[in-house]
């Protein structure tokens, strides 16, 4: 843990997500869902520190849009997994930062 955040380098490459039963209500865009979280993960994402309850903002460009997935630690305590707590299009400032960092 760096700065109290979970270590993204320990996440399982194939199955890193612990999806809560009520995750659907966390999506701010009606056309984004769990499949998009998988797309962000498989698109060589960048990670930015987040405000609680998330530890990280996982960002990647998917189909021309920068998507952001806030990640919280696994409820089970498994360091190989984390909980995505949303999925939405990045705000212009974060999208710009992501594109500069790429």
Language-model features and meaning:
Residues 1-102:
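Ribonuclease/tRNase effector modules and their secretory precursors
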């Amino acid at each position: 843990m760096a700065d109290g955040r979970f270590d993204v380098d320990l996440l399982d490459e194939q199955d890193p997500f612990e999806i809560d039963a009520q995750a659907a209500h966390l999506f701010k865009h009606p056309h984004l869902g769990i499949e998009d979280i998988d797309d962000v993960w498989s698109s060589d994402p960048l990670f930015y520190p987040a405000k609680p309850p998330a530890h990280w903002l996982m960002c990647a460009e998917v189909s021309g849009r920068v998507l952001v997935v806030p990640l919280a630690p696994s409820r089970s305590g498994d360091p190989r997994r984390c909980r995505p707590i949303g999925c939405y299009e990045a705000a212009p400032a974060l999208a710009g930062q992501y594109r500069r960092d790429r």
